[in-house]
Regions:
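Conserved hydrolase catalytic core segment
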Residues: 116, 120-123, 170-219
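Conserved acidic catalytic loop of the alpha/beta-hydrolase fold
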Residues: 155-173
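Conserved alpha/beta-hydrolase
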Residues: 117-143
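The serine-hydrolase catalytic nucleophile loop
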Residues: 103-115
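Glycine-rich "HGGG/HGxG" loop immediately N-terminal to the catalytic nucleophile
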Residues: 60-62, 125, 138-152, 186, ...
Length: 380
């Protein structure tokens, strides 16, 4: 295994872009949904309009240049080439911070927070709150290599991230994550406590412990949210955790299908007042979809569910490092501090956010940055 770190730039061939436009123009559309809302899925009218825009107006070359404004690299870890952004702060005493995305996200989620985190003095902050930021693409996502063997679940990714931080010369660092990134960040806190100074998560990984008595009102809200997710929002998860390969054929072949599969979650999981374009721009949404389409990672990205909902699902991480939680009101599941304290023994920071959902850094970058700064300020 080589420890070499190689510079990387996104450069998608014209043939890939021409093929995308051809597929979009020749989409075979289904009939429209039979309801006036999103309860049967992403509405045909909107998906058709998004795909028309994608084909006729979306400027990938301009977006590609924007994505390339941050330094990117690849390095081999445990047999896989891992793609990552590494943006060092101009402030020499900055704290290293590894930030991890989930599904259906990507490193695109963090493009609005990297500059405020690395150079706070230019963004209304203090140099004492600066970070050296590392944003890896999960294995099988974006420009990271697709695993060739099974075994790439949460624990293995977490240990790989510890290797990455060591390779970059960071002997003490913080970790932050949402969605799968929260699970991986939690595993880092459990596995690499010697070097991980603390973890900050936006999706609290906890379940209700066996306690006597009736649930509190806070716990009832969480339990109702869990039930709603199980009844109405979890079909994607069941498919990806059981038959990711089957799903991959359709999504890898159809850009409209890939877009609908992803964008529906930006309706369901954002604090968007009923429509994802109320909170995120059309170009931003398509930037994220493009990192799945141009890399043909529909199946490989879905496999993290297959890997992590098997034996790993029964793994309970006991975390003793300082922990911070940012609870956004439209997160998939409302976090409950009492539940978390059964596995997280050192919760030092808990914020109830006024707005925002599952894609915290993408939706509410200022709130996200302020909370990350506030938590890690205690650990420097």
């Amino acid at each position: 295994m080589s420890a070499e770190i190689k510079p990387y730039r996104i450069s998608i061939g014209d043939d890939v872009l021409d093929d995308l436009k051809s597929r979009l123009r020749n989409t075979r559309w289904p009939e429209a949904e039979l309801v006036e809302d999103w309860s049967q899925g992403a509405p045909l009218k909107w998906i058709k309009d998004i795909c028309r825009y994608w084909s006729e107006e979306y400027d990938w070359r301009g977006r590609e240049a924007r994505l390339n404004r941050f330094a990117q690299f690849t390095t081999e870890i445990d047999g896989l080439d891992i793609h990552f952004l590494h943006v060092r702060s101009p402030h020499p005493e900055a704290m290293p911070l590894i930030i991890t995305h989930g599904w259906p996200g990507s490193v695109v989620e963090f493009h609005k927070v990297i500059e405020p985190l690395t150079d706070p003095t230019v963004h209304g902050g203090n140099a004492a709150d600066a970070f050296h930021v590392v944003c890896p693409s999960l294995p099988g996502f974006g420009f990271s290599e697709k695993p060739k063997t099974t075994g790439w679940g949460v624990g293995r990714i977490a240990s790989s991230w510890a290797v990455l931080m060591d390779r970059l010369g960071y002997s003490r660092y913080g970790a932050q994550g949402g969605d799968w990134g929260s699970a991986i960040t939690t595993a880092i806190g459990a596995q690499d406590a010697e070097h991980c100074a603390g973890i900050h998560v936006t999706l609290a990984m906890s379940t209700r412990p066996n306690v006597e008595g009736q649930p509190t009102p806070e716990e009832m809200r969480a339990l109702n949210g869990i039930q709603h997710y199980a009844d109405w929002d979890s079909g994607y998860s069941k498919q990806q955790s059981t038959r990711p390969q089957t799903l991959g054929y359709g999504l890898t072949d159809s850009p409209s299908g890939q877009a609908a599969w992803i964008l529906e979650k930006f309706w369901a999981w954002t604090d968007c007042d009923g429509h994802p374009e109320n909170i995120l721009g059309r170009d931003e949404l398509l930037d994220n979809v493009m990192l799945y389409w141009v890399t043909a990672t529909a199946a490989s990205s879905a496999r993290i569910y297959w890997e992590s909902f098997g034996a790993e699902r029964r793994t309970v991480h006991k975390v003793g490092v300082p922990t911070g939680v940012a609870a956004f009101p439209r997160e998939i599941v409302t976090p409950v501090r009492r539940w978390m304290e059964t596995n997280f023994s050192n919760i030092q920071h808990w914020s109830e956010m006024p707005k925002g959902g599952h894609f915290a850094a993408f939706e509410q970058p200022a709130l996200f940055v302020d909370d990350v700064r506030a938590f890690f300020r205690k650990l420097r």
